[in-house]
């Protein structure tokens, strides 16, 4: 954003309520996960992506992970667009939460629920839901919860089928 004086950040990598006649509204639903407010936020997300991403990719395949990232970006973008008309969202935290939950399915065997999944749900999603219930939650917590729920949906769905999707 510095080279373009913030234009790319605002117009490409940040989703917010804008007119449906603005053609940039549609790519923003996906591209907002590539924008970050600062380098520290980028670093914290990329480190987690680099740790859990390969596990999830090894188990479920690159095509499925790319689909999961795109759908998570779309869902979190739409949540903002519909429910937070005065808000703006950028960052990959929803995708990070989705991958954390999805990676916990990596060792899942048929008919079992991995202990790591239970712990991830209690620690990560439980904290986000607690913040939502106590009223201290905002858009960030909602995107984390959405990412975690999507990670569970993808994990349970793909763990039932055969491995692949590469």
Predicted features and spans:
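A detector for small-residue-rich transmembrane helices and their helix-helix packing motifs
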Residues: 1-166
């Amino acid at each position: 954003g510095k080279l373009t004086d913030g234009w790319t950040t605002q117009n490409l990598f940040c989703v917010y309520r804008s007119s449906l006649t603005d053609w940039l509204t549609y790519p923003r639903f996906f591209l907002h996960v590539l924008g970050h407010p600062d380098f520290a936020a980028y670093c914290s997300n990329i480190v987690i992506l680099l740790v859990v991403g390969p596990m999830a990719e090894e188990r479920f395949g690159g095509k499925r992970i790319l689909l999961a990232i795109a759908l998570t970006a779309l869902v979190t973008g739409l949540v903002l667009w519909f429910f937070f008309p005065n808000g703006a969202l950028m960052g990959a935290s929803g995708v990070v939460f989705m991958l954390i939950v999805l990676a916990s399915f990596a060792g899942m065997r048929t008919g079992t629920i991995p202990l790591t999944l239970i712990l991830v749900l209690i620690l990560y999603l439980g904290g986000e839901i607690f913040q939502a219930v106590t009223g201290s939650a905002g858009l960030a917590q909602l995107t984390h919860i959405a990412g975690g729920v999507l990670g569970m949906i993808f994990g349970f769905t793909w763990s039932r089928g055969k491995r692949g999707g590469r």
